[in-house]
């Protein structure tokens, strides 16, 4: 679980669970062998914007530069195909169903999960993903928490966003230890558009706060 940073939330947590016995960060858990060591790759996205884009709302910017950005989506698709050349279990996290469908249609041997799926559908999709070689699972924010798939070898954050908690919770999906992997590879994108560039910088700060290895 992601421990809250604000004092009141931490006190509420302590009141329910008891006093802190030992404070261990992600780096410590990695060093002690409880989490898989990650390598984070920040992939720059070419600036295709115009002056007029500064007048767009955040929702409009997100749709243009993330959901429907053909150049960016092609980068994600080609990245997945390249990884699939070797044994792998790839998790791609997106924000909305439309983005999930775009990637699902273009990436071979991919599976898709969304919030409206009932429990039986989720379980079957996850099992199919686990049992298939060189497979890709594309999920909306449902994949951020509550899903335990330790076999994940590669995580692609295709959704952007700036929230530290959301970023670290997504990261946690891939750090589970499993006999099939010695390392896990994380891919994130440095978008150059209004709102999105600032959000990318915030995510990098979140990774750096854990002392993780980052390639920019």
Spans of model-derived segments:
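Post-DEXD/H (motif II) to motif III coupling segment of the RecA-like Helicase ATP-binding lobe
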Residues: 1-41, 207
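Conserved SF2 helicase motif VI
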Residues: 2-3, 162-186, 203-204
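Switch/connector loops and helix/strand junctions flanking conserved nucleotide-binding motifs
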Residues: 4-10, 24, 50-52, 146-149, ...
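Conserved P-loop NTPase
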Residues: 32, 36-56, 206-213
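Conserved interdomain hinge at the start of the Helicase C-terminal
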Residues: 50-106
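Conserved helicase ATPase core of P-loop NTP-dependent helicases/translocases
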Residues: 89-93, 98-102, 108-147, 166
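A short beta-strand element within the Helicase C-terminal
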Residues: 138-139, 144-161, 166-169, 183-189
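C-terminal helicase lobe
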Residues: 178-216
